[in-house]
Amino acid sequence: MNNFKFVALNHQEFDHLNDLTIQELSERDIVLMTVNQFPGFPCRITLEDAEMGEEVFLINYDHHPVNSPYKASGPVFIRKNKATKAYPINVIPKMFLHRLLSLRAYDENGMMIEADVFEGHILRDKIEDFFNNEKIDYLHIHNAKPGCFNCLVKKVQDADQ
């Protein structure tokens, strides 16, 4: 079995947003929203669904800054005033288990090697299957219907990392 680790976005990239006005956010093409559906606003720094009434930023994020044709950015939700949550090795955050997901596998050069769409409850099996391919260096999880990036999944060589 290959060990893996879910990697959330670093909240420090977004902390400055907490101090901006609606006008300043708008000038940066960022929208401050109030969560009105649960689940429905998956946060990329906590890898949890934001709670009803909570505020989230909707931003365009450069989630695959590679020198390949697969360079990509897209919309993501960031919970206001939250810190990055770290997950232990081989732990899958529960927000992934109830979504239709797209798993994209990349090599060390940022080239896509494999991809699949499936229900989240089989995510662990898909991660293990993909990481059995030695050419695959890392994975990206996206929400399949809207196509939005969720997080990076790294292959971990040593269970103590």
Regions found by a protein language model. Give the residues of each.
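Extended boundary segments
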Residues: 1-19
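Conserved mixed alpha/beta catalytic, RNA-binding, or beta-rich assembly cores of soluble enzyme
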Residues: 22-116, 126-127
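Generic beta-strand structural signal
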Residues: 74, 99-101, 137-139, 147-149
